[in-house]
Amino acid sequence: MPITCGDIPRLICSVIIPPVGVFFQVGCTKDLAINCLLTVLGYIPGVIHAVYILIKE
């Protein structure tokens, strides 16, 4: 699925605060919990996971 103009704000949120971008994309799901854990363990893994979720959806 190509990235649209509506994805740009989510992508920016995902780079600044990864769980926020994931929450906007999928809501309160296991992906959000995984992203919160990855962000706490290391910022870069959280960003990578958030971008993956945005591109996957």
Swiss-Prot record:
This is Protein Ric1. It comes from the Eukaryota. It is a multi-pass membrane protein. The lineage of its organism: Eukaryota, Sar, Stramenopiles, Oomycota, Peronosporales. It is found in: Membrane. One of its GO terms (cellular component) is membrane. InterPro entries: PMP3. The chain crosses the membrane at residues 8-28, 34-54. Its main location: membrane. Coiled coil: none annotated. Keywords: Membrane, Transmembrane, Transmembrane helix. Belongs to the UPF0057 (PMP3) family. Disulfide bonds: none annotated.
